[in-house]
Amino acid sequence: SCVRSGRAATRIKELLERTGLEKTVMLTRMTGDVCRLDYNPLKPAGAEENHNARREVLTFLRRAGLEISGESLTGPFAGAITHFHSADFRQEGGPYSAYTPVPLVPMVLHGKVTYAADVDRRYGECLSILYGCTCSEEWTAATPLRHITDRFYLVALPWSRLAAKPMLAWRRSDTTQTIIFGESDYVQADLERESYRVVVGGYTIARDCVTTCPVGRRRMAVYSKYGAPLRLKLPPGWPETGEIRALLLREDGQHEEQRLKSRDGHLEMEAPEGRPIILSA
């Protein structure tokens, strides 16, 4: 085979020299078809041999210092590759669409790999947060900044607070699903109502397109997809009553500063549509 003869290592070395690849590479055809066969009569190869050879190629690339991501999430390559750009978690139209969706694959792979998925857009941010399909999209120069900002503050930031916690249980009651990460850490979503809630340490960090996520000691990111008046219960450690500094971030990288007042552990403020705010005390 190419691996045993040393040709694979030579080709990879040539590839790196000619392309200048560094840091990372995405392989589009490496992982999708697990049971690939080679019917070449001169050098036939079965599924196991083919799979093992591909894993050797991945080893060569890692030794060259490259972080590898794959296209399609498949079990045999989970771990050999740590990020996949496509996982099939369709709610309708898939091979199991007649059955009740259960987040079995996310619970098995959570903490081992990251992945994205083409989720049903009818469910907004709910499904991405519930199943952890939060980790990649294809953005180009034509991608609206507002879309990127929505994805970061509404999905990626809240999920980052759960990514390192183990998935412990899944529960369903009527149309509401809950994934439990700890005694006071969970995601709860009702897909039909496009309603969700993310709770970490007993504190709600995201709810129905509004994010109120602590990002450090006495610092919080606030973001509203549609704009809304908010009455926030401040996290533990914040002053019950006092001055709160609010930085309204702008597209040009600058900010506008406001001074707000907290009272009795709560803060009333107006969150503008699609405008990140950083609070500090």
Predicted regions and their residues:
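Active-site-proximal substrate-binding groove within the catalytic cores of carbohydrate-active enzymes
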Residues: 2-22, 31-276
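Short helix- or helix-capping micro-motifs
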Residues: 28
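Short beta-strand-to-coil "C-cap" segments at the C-terminal boundary of structured domains/repeats
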Residues: 279-281
